[in-house]
Amino acid sequence: MNHTNKTAQYNTLIEQIKSLVADEHNKVGILANVSEEMKQTFPNEYFWVGFYFVQDDELQLGPFQGTVACMRIAKGRGVCGTAWNENRTLVVPDVERFAGHIACSSLSRSEIVVPIRETGSGRVLGVIDIDSTSLDTFDEKDAEKLEEIAKILAETVGESKNNL
């Protein structure tokens, strides 16, 4: 997919997400709808899309769209735990080359994980996790736009989202 088309799709997605979260307070409903909207926007790129949130010093599974997922991930383990531990977005072109990758699905070939940071402190509240069945699916444009989405979600569901 070319960058111009990808950017346009993300811009439309971001506007849809803003509309979905406006005046809503049901955290589970918001996140379920956002994950579905994300997957529908990129049906050929996103095999699995969902959220993990920091609770009891581990990442715990939140709403998602896709196959059965790992329920808990330790800090520093796999792509999600590493993104949380390092408080940075990770783009993994080939998950089999990522040391310590947790294979929740054998179909996953590439992955991007984006921290959802508390507004102000920057503390990681959770992560957006997206997997693809193709190698090298994600790039810096995905990272940039998904970080915008993470910011919207942090402002919308706030710190209390740890208590889904």
Name each region found by the language model:
Residues 1-63, 68, 156-164:
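Intrinsically disordered, low-complexity terminal regulatory regions
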Residues 2, 18, 132-164:
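Juxtadomain coupling helices with adjacent low-complexity linkers
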Residues 56, 119, 133-135:
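Short coil/turn motifs at secondary-structure junctions
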Residues 124-127:
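Short glycine-/small-residue motifs
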Residues 54-106:
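Regulatory sensory and allosteric helical modules in signal-transduction proteins
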Residues 110-119:
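A short, aliphatic-rich beta-strand micro-motif
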Residues 86, 120-121:
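Residue-level recognition of short loop/turn positions
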